[in-house]
Amino acid sequence: MQTEHVILLNAQGVPTGTLEKYAAHTADTLLHLAFSSWLFNAKGQLLVTRRALSKKAWPGVWTNSVCGHPQLGESNEEAVIRRCRYELGVEITPPESIYPDFRYRATDPNGIVENEVCPVFAARTTSALQINDDEVMDYQWCDLAAVLRGIDATPWAFSPWMVMQATNREARKRLSAFTQLK
């Protein structure tokens, strides 16, 4: 995969430039555009992934299915599809927006900051996973209700963005719709 960049944003969310992704994530990370996606299988189960230990921010942490950064000229939905192929080796249904105005700032134990405008999506797949070990070290298909109970009981065991997304009432409602079999 070619070098990725983040799209830098001003306080109003207007693009101001780009920066190489690895260089962008520091103790003083500038506000930038990202996305987060929750992926469900044909049984209505959620894919929870554990970030590879080589990840700069939150290595080894359990999180939602896939996250990333749209590239210049790429829609958020196109970016979700691209990252699902790259990280998980799967084709997905068109991503659906479940929390369009999510924005957060969090600092990991190593001092790396995430500072993102991060629309949240959900999608389905019927493909078999082909995990990219550079991105994901472990994964589990889980019942959404069990994951939400785990987040409520032990939020420290999950990425902060996953916790913040999952504790939003409207996002929970929209995620629950993906557990219904089609």
Curated annotation (Swiss-Prot):
Residues that hold Mn(2+) according to the record: H25, H32, H69, E114, E116
Signal peptide: none
EC number: 5.3.3.2
Main location class: cytoplasm
Protein name (database record): Isopentenyl-diphosphate Delta-isomerase
Binding of Mg(2+), residues: E87
Alphabetized GO MF terms: isopentenyl-diphosphate delta-isomerase activity; metal ion binding
Originating species: Escherichia coli O1:K1 / APEC
GO cellular component: cytoplasm
